[in-house]
Structure formats: structure tokens, C-alpha cells
């Protein structure tokens, strides 16, 4: 699974996931499914934010990266992907500026158009079950919840899906692609089932030495949302090598 993650996701997303797991004392060599889940969640959050801006009239617009209007205000503030200290600093700043109620748990995004925090969920289970779990944990009407599944289903607070249909379709397509690529490599069942995951981990550990010398193909493209986070954790020499838009899993 670890090899798949490094091949399938942008290196910047992988590094953010590594930092997140390290911050919580988790070993990605052992918890490979969690590693994959964190990378997937990060990518969905960045895709959610990509290309969405607010114009001078306060309207939400979708703008391609190379459009000169890209200097407009970003609609979403990205909180996910930052270390906890910085994330809470961003949340506090938003609350002080907008008057929003401070959430008890760190959300993933803030929507400047709707003036609300957003919690993004990506689930391998039924969307309504995961939605209820999120809602019971957060217990706040001020945090909007939006859940995506790998099967193309979604569920959001009061059926308010925030984004336009095309933007959500991009996210659903990406999740479906990840699922298919996992299935093609025999990883999907272990990703869904903890019991299968333990079996897969043993196989992964045995095959690591055999695969160590193999070349790895990784896309060097990234989303504009990720570029916002780059200065916090990447040197400019590495940043220059990464271009806009999202990667796709390499074919076998």
C-alpha cells in the first residue's frame, strides 16, 4: 500500500500526510491504510478549494489557474494540511475577523462566501452512517459537513452541496479512480477491511526488499490549493519543480 500511495499521490500531499502521522506518533510503515486515507482526504480538501474565488460583488466564481482573475479572493481558507498550532491560529484569525463561532474540533476549510467552517469526510462505508458519526462528534450547527464516498455518493448538511456539480464531479471521479487503481493492485479489500489489512501488511513487509530497487513513477503536478501551503514547509527549489492541476495514478 505504501508504494501505491507514493506512486498515486502528489509528492506534496504525501509529505503532508507523513508530517501529520509523525505529529500524532503514528508509523506509516505499519498503518499504511491510514496513510492512504490521509492522502485521499488531503487531496479532496484541496480539490474542493481549487479554482473557487469571490469577485468584487461577493459572488462565487470558478476561475482557471492561468486566468488573470486568479488574483481575486480565494473562496475557501484551507485549514487541513497545516500543523495543529498553525491550524488553530488560522481558525482563531478567521473567528476574530468574521465573528464566526470557534469550533471545538479543527475543521478542514472555511467558506468565505457562506461564512461557515466545513468538515470534509471521505468514507469507504455508507455515506449516511459516516455523516451521522461526524455530526454526533462535532455537535455544531455552525460547521457544515460534506461527505464523499468512493462509489460516487455524497451527503451534506441540509442537502447543501456548496460546490457546483462539475467541481463535485471532479472529486467523485478522482475517488473512483483511486478505488479502481487499488482494486487493480489487489489493495481495495484490505483498505476497506481491517482483517484484510493485516494480511496485506504482512505481504507488503515481505515484498519491500524485492521492490526497493524498482523505479517509481510520480506525477510532479499539483493543485493551486497546495501552492498556498508550499511556503510553510517546502523550499523554493522543490516548489519550482511542481506545476498546476492534479495527478492521476500511473497505469500498471
Curated annotation (Swiss-Prot):
Top-level taxon of origin: Viruses
Annotated catalytic residues: 80, 108
Name of the protein in its database record: Protein PA-X
GO MF term (any one): RNA binding
Function per UniProt: Plays a major role in the shutoff of the host protein expression by cleaving mRNAs probably via an endonuclease activity. This host shutoff allows the virus to escape from the host antiviral response. Hijacks host RNA splicing machinery to selectively target host RNAs containing introns for destruction. This may explain the preferential degradation of RNAs that have undergone co- or post-transcriptional processing.
Record keywords: Decay of host mRNAs by virus, Eukaryotic host gene expression shutoff by virus, Host cytoplasm, Host gene expression shutoff by virus, Host mRNA suppression by virus, Host nucleus, Host-virus interaction
Pfam families hit by this protein: Flu_PA
Residue(s) at site: Important for efficient shutoff activity and nuclear localization: 195, 198-199
Annotated domain remarks: The probable endonuclease active site in the N-terminus and the basic amino acid cluster in the C-terminus are important for the shutoff activity. The C-terminus acts as a nuclear localization signal. The C-terminus is recruited to host protein complexes involved in nuclear Pol II RNA processing.
GO biological process assignments: viral RNA genome replication; viral translational frameshifting
Protein family membership: Belongs to the influenza viruses PA-X family.
Coiled coil: none
Signal peptide, first to last residue: none
Marked site positions, Important for efficient shutoff activity: 28, 65, 202-203, 206
InterPro entries registered for this protein in UniProt: PA/PA-X, PA/PA-X_sf
Main location: host cell
Subcellular location: Host cytoplasm; Host nucleus
Amino acid at each position: 500500500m505504501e508504494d501505491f500511495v507514493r506512486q498515486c499521490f502528489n509528492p506534496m500531499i504525501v509529505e503532508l500526510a507523513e508530517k501529520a502521522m509523525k505529529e500524532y506518533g503514528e508509523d506509516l510503515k505499519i498503518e499504511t491504510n491510514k496513510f492512504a486515507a490521509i492522502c485521499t482526504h488531503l487531496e479532496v480538501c484541496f480539490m474542493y478549494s481549487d479554482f473557487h474565488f469571490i469577485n468584487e460583488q461577493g459572488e462565487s466564481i470558478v476561475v482557471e489557474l492561468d486566468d488573470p482573475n486568479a488574483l481575486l479572493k480565494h473562496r475557501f481558507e484551507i485549514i487541513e494540511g497545516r500543523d495543529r498550532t498553525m491550524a488553530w491560529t488560522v481558525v482563531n484569525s478567521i473567528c476574530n475577523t468574521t465573528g464566526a463561532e470557534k469550533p471545538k474540533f479543527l475543521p478542514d476549510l472555511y467558506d468565505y462566501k457562506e461564512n461557515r467552517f466545513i468538515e470534509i469526510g471521505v468514507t469507504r462505508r455508507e455515506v449516511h452512517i459516516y455523516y451521522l458519526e461526524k455530526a454526533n462528534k462535532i455537535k455544531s450547527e455552525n460547521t457544515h459537513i460534506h461527505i464523499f464516498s468512493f462509489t460516487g455518493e455524497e451527503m451534506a448538511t441540509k442537502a447543501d452541496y456548496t460546490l457546483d456539480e462539475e467541481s463535485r464531479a471532479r472529486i467523485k471521479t478522482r475517488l473512483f479512480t483511486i478505488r479502481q487503481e487499488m482494486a487493480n493492485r489487489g489493495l481495495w479489500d484490505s483498505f476497506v477491511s481491517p482483517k484484510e489489512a493485516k494480511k496485506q501488511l504482512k505481504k507488503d513487509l515481505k515484498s519491500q526488499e524485492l521492490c526497493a530497487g524498482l523505479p517509481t513513477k510520480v506525477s510532479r503536478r499539483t493543485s493551486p490549493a497546495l501552492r498556498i501551503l508550499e511556503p510553510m514547509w517546502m523550499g523554493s527549489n522543490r516548489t519550482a519543480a511542481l506545476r498546476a492541476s492534479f495527478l492521476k495514478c500511473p497505469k500498471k
